């Protein structure tokens, strides 16, 4: 079955093409740390031959506590992204939380992301669609894979068909997430075989029911990423940090930066193997 291709500049994103890495840090903590992390990702992905898009948030607008670090904000965040693009020649993805942010962010970065908690907000979807930018839609934890077709339809109605879908797990009882591996194929089907990627980092979140910050299970990141990529996906969404224990957001889920090359070597081997197989139709 023909898979839809979404182009991010010269990077082609599709379920049957070599996977694209959307990787970086959870939130921009400083200009220097962003430069350090981006440089390491660029070095490793170039060595392994993996198409790469840098990711980070300029504002974490949905933190559990009002006292938690949110990021440098729109103006300073865009300056950092511009410097990363100029220095390393990378494409950049970041999330927007308000309709008024869509165009200013799209003027700087290459992919704008619709956060999971906001994925059904029509005004935000319409504003993002109007930019003409490539869109990454995070599947909400409370929405089934089949319902993602409705969100994609909103973007199409807004004149934008450059849509990527991203799964980050589903609520399983209280304060826990699980990843339904069967959901990836459902998301492909209801979106006209749009590219589907896997956010392995946020799928590892495990909240403290009485705390103000997310816990995580980064010790299982390799196993979960290998399982997801074995389905046959367009990309992997990954967050890393040189010192996860002291990261300002979601450190418990972040891959230690020093392990990146070893981790990606395994993921690429699985992706190469899976995409070497002929398509097998088991419905007929």
UniProtKB/Swiss-Prot annotation:
Any single GO molecular-function term of the entry would be:
3-deoxy-8-phosphooctulonate synthase activity
Protein name (Swiss-Prot/TrEMBL): 2-dehydro-3-deoxyphosphooctonate aldolase
* Record-level GO cellular component terms: cytosol
Entry keyword ATP-binding: no
Q: What is its EC number?
A: 2.5.1.55
Which pathway does this polypeptide act in?
Carbohydrate biosynthesis; 3-deoxy-D-manno-octulosonate biosynthesis; 3-deoxy-D-manno-octulosonate from D-ribulose 5-phosphate: step 2/3; Bacterial outer membrane biogenesis; lipopolysaccharide biosynthesis
Major site of localization recorded for this protein: cytoplasm
Family indicated by similarity? Belongs to the KdsA family.
Biological process annotations from GO: keto-3-deoxy-D-manno-octulosonic acid biosynthetic process
Reactions catalysed according to its record: D-arabinose 5-phosphate + phosphoenolpyruvate + H2O = 3-deoxy-alpha-D-manno-2-octulosonate-8-phosphate + phosphate
Question: Organism source for this protein?
Answer: Salmonella typhimurium (strain LT2 / SGSC1412 / ATCC 700720)
């Amino acid at each position: 079955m023909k898979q839809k291709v979404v182009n991010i500049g010269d990077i082609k994103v599709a379920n049957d093409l070599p996977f694209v890495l959307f990787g970086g840090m959870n939130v921009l903590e400083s200009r220097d740390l962003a430069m350090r992390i981006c440089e390491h990702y660029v070095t490793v992905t170039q060595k392994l031959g993996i198409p790469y898009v840098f990711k980070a948030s300029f504002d974490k607008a949905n933190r559990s506590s009002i006292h938690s670090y949110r990021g440098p904000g729109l103006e300073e965040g865009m300056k950092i992204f511009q410097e990363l693009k100029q220095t390393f020649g990378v494409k950049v993805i970041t999330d927007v939380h308000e309709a008024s942010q869509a165009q200013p962010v799209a003027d700087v970065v290459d992919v704008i992301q619709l956060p999971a908690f906001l994925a059904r907000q029509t005004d935000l979807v319409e504003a993002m669609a109007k930019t003409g930018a490539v869109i990454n839609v995070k599947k909400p934890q409370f929405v089934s894979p089949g319902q993602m077709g409705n969100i994609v339809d909103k973007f199409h109605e807004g004149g934008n068909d450059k849509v990527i879908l991203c799964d980050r797990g589903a609520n399983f009882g209280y304060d826990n997430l699980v990843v339904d591996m069967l959901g990836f194929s459902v998301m492909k089907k209801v979106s006209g075989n749009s590219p589907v990627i896997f956010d392995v980092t946020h799928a590892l979140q495990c909240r403290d029911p009485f705390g103000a910050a997310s816990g995580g299970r980064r010790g299982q990141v390799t196993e979960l990423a290998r399982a997801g990529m074995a389905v046959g996906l367009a990309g992997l969404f990954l967050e890393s940090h040189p010192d996860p224990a002291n990261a300002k957001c979601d450190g418990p889920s972040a891959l230690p930066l020093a392990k990146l090359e070893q981790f990606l070597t395994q993921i690429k081997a699985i992706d190469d193997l899976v995409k070497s197989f002929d398509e097998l139709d088991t419905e007929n």
